[in-house]
Regions:
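Non-catalytic, well-ordered alpha-helical scaffold segments
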Residues: 20-23, 47, 51, 87-92, ...
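Short, compositionally biased low-complexity segments
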Residues: 1, 16-32, 64-69, 95-103, ...
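Non-catalytic, polymerase-adjacent accessory regions of viral genome-replication enzymes
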Residues: 1-52
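Active-site-flanking structural segment that lines cofactor/substrate pockets
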Residues: 47-77
């Protein structure tokens, strides 16, 4: 199965760094932030910047820029590691062409994390559907036990609400890289993904603030 997948997916990195794919990725990255001088300046020379980026990727001379680090305090305190626009352009193209479809293909339908078309409303609708199904099943079981239909019924049950404490900060780089390599069969994509992970420094901790980081963490949870 892996040989078949490798045969079909071996060209994905090449597709991700096509000029059109990179240009489209840049336009997506600029949405909602064109008011920033740095974004406006980069987009003003979009064609030239995209061409230069593609040439560096083709010839293996591409290097990640330094990160912008800052702290947000709402809804809770988080340290953000922001990727420069040039790097986000490449990473968005890589996510769209390879990482997103490869990593999310194994997720269950109810998983709405970083899923296209699956926002908060989707998650609430699915939770409502599951609660309604649970209520019907419990009521039917109670009616079967007593031999007649019930009017009003209160179904007892539990909902598990949890969070992984310091998940991004505590993830070992080796674990994240292995989780992605298990799902992505394109060697160039795996190599660049590993470089992005290692760029955060140390052996633990994935920077919070990019789509690549989010997809890596979802792959870890799905291991």
């Amino acid at each position: 199965m892996r040989d078949s997948a490798a045969k079909n997916m071996g060209k994905q990195f090449d597709e991700a760094i096509q000029f059109g794919a990179l240009y489209k990725a840049l336009k997506k990255c600029c949405r909602g932030v064109r008011w920033k001088p740095s974004t406006a300046g980069y987009e003003h020379y979009a064609l030239a910047n995209t061409y230069r980026l593609r040439q560096e990727l083709l010839h293996g001379s591409y290097k990640l820029s330094s990160y912008q680090r800052f702290t947000i305090r709402e809804p809770k305190v988080r340290d953000i590691v922001a990727t420069r626009l040039r790097d986000r352009q490449f990473q968005r193209a890589l996510c769209d062409a390879v990482l997103y479809p490869s990593i999310t293909s194994s997720f269950i339908y109810d998983n709405g994390a970083c899923q296209r078309g699956k926002g908060v409303d989707f998650a609430l609708d699915r939770m409502t559907a599951h609660l309604q199904q649970y209520y019907r099943e419990q009521k039917q079981a109670a009616e079967a036990a007593i031999g007649h239909r019930l009017g009003r019924f209160c179904a007892g049950g539990w909902v598990l609400a949890c969070d992984v404490r310091h998940f991004f900060d505590s993830t070992p780089h080796a674990v994240a890289k292995a989780a992605v390599a298990k799902r992505v069969y394109d060697s160039e994509t795996v190599r660049h993904n590993a470089r992005i992970i290692d760029s955060f420094g140390g052996e633990r901790g994935i920077g919070l603030g990019s789509q690549v980081s989010q997809l890596n963490q979802l792959a870890v949870l799905d291991t």
